Swiss-Prot record:
It comes from Caenorhabditis elegans. Residues 35-48 are annotated as: G1 motif. Residues 266-273 are annotated as: G4 motif. Mg(2+) binds at residues 47, 182. GO terms for biological process: adenylate cyclase-modulating G protein-coupled receptor signaling pathway; cellular response to cGMP; dauer larval development; defense response to Gram-negative bacterium; determination of adult lifespan; G protein-coupled receptor signaling pathway; negative regulation of gene expression; phototransduction. SMART domains: G_alpha. Residues 197-206 are annotated as: G3 motif. Keywords: GTP-binding, Lipoprotein, Magnesium, Metal-binding, Myristate, Nucleotide-binding, Palmitate, Transducer. PROSITE patterns: G_ALPHA. The gene is gpa-3. Residues 32-353 form the G-alpha domain. This is Guanine nucleotide-binding protein alpha-3 subunit. A lipid is attached at residue 2 (N-myristoyl glycine). One of its GO terms (cellular component) is heterotrimeric G-protein complex. Residues 324-329 are annotated as: G5 motif. The lineage of its organism: Eukaryota, Metazoa, Ecdysozoa, Nematoda, Chromadorea.
């Protein structure tokens, strides 16, 4: 009899907890807004993650918004070739075909052509494509870590046949890869599992960080994004500082800040696709001279994870790490679903459930 009563009590307790949990989720949906803060150094991929959240949970981009992105894509395409030409000069490389010098001069003087452009100018597109097909330009791209080459350069420059068409409309991938510097605060709102989320992206370059303080109050979780592929690159705003080291310094200050003692900390080691290619050519020793492991993806990535984890001064705080490719919508969806589930559970536990 006692055993039967115990089993009944257990079942009643489980039902009670399930009801409590459902009531709390309903309560959260009515009164609780979960605030997420996206942090990271400049060009780590925060804005791309935010765009993915819009695609996955906020109905994506309207036709009007896609149309507005055309000018960004046009400028990114021109900026990509301009950066490569500056890189060629810095590396003292010459064109395979000397006639390309005329195209280079034309491109470097063409920024005003895009100011009001509704269609990518044909003459400019032809010059960029001629340069893109030059063997020396392809060799410079392989040395992109030695100068400030946009990571989207190969995508946009190889897509000019499509981008220059009169009826061109940016694809989802074009929008994900397009970039303008984030200044101030960008917000995305969405609802998932009956919970309202507000996600903030703030400027990652040094001059923007003083503005982060306005986002700090009542933050439920931080998604810190570090570009794992940038271990051999320097900052845009300070070419004496390694990007990976800067990212680790920033992570340490955020992770151990008094503002975030009770805040869930999620680390996205982003651009894993670029890291996988780069590690075949260049060891992480450029950022970590003490590294003794093999020049492989798994071992190098594990070492970097341990480095970040070691920056956490609170033994009771767990850093939830994920290796990500922010431009891969399917992978981002899987990781974001896992992260959001974890955040919801953490909030329920915080309410005693």
């Amino acid at each position: 009899m006692g055993l039967c009563q115990s089993a009944e009590d257990k079942e009643l307790t489980l039902k009670s907890k399930a009801i409590d949990k459902e009531m709390m989720q309903n309560h959260m949906s009515q009164q609780k807004v979960v605030k997420l803060l996206l942090l990271g150094a400049g060009e780590c991929g925060k804005s791309t993650v935010l765009k993915q959240m819009r695609i996955l949970h906020d109905h994506g981009f309207t036709a009007e918004e896609a149309e507005q992105q055309k000018s960004v894509v046009f400028n990114n395409t021109l900026q990509a070739m301009t950066a490569i030409l500056k890189g060629m000069e810095a590396l003292r490389m010459t064109f395979d075909k000397p006639i390309r010098e005329n195209d280079a001069k034309f491109v470097m003087e063409s920024h005003k052509m895009l100011q009001e452009a509704k269609v990518f100018p044909e003459e400019l597109a032809n010059a960029i494509q001629a340069l893109w097909n030059d063997k020396a330009v392809q060799q410079v791209i392989a040395k992109g870590n030695e100068f400030q080459m946009p990571e989207s350069a190969p995508h946009f420059l190889s897509s000019l046949d499509r981008i220059k068409l009169p009826d061109y409309n940016p694809t989802e991938q074009d929008i994900l890869l397009s970039r303008i510097k984030t200044t101030g605060i960008v917000e995305v709102k969405f609802q998932m599992k009956s919970v309202d989320f507000r996600v903030f992206d703030v400027g990652g370059q040094r001059s923007e960080r003083k503005k982060w303080i306005h986002c700090f109050e009542d933050v439920n979780a931080i998604i810190f994004i570090a570009a794992i592929s940038e271990y051999d690159q320097v900052l845009f705003e300070d070419e004496t500082t390694n990007r990976m080291i800067e990212s680790m310094r920033l992570f340490e200050s955020i992770c151990n800040s008094r503002w975030f003692i009770n805040t869930s900390m999620i680390l996205f080691l982003n651009k894993k696709d670029l890291f996988a290619e780069k590690i075949k050519r260049t060891s992480i020793k450029s950022a970590f001279p003490d590294y003794k492991g093999a020049q492989t993806y798994d071992e190098s990535c594990r070492y970097i994870e341990e480095k970040f984890d070691g920056l956490n001064a609170n033994p009771e705080k767990t850093i939830y790490m994920h290796q990500t490719c922010a431009t891969d919508t399917d992978q981002v969806q899987m990781i974001l679903d896992s992260v959001i589930d974890m955040i919801i559970q953490a909030n329920l536990q915080g309410c005693g459930l």
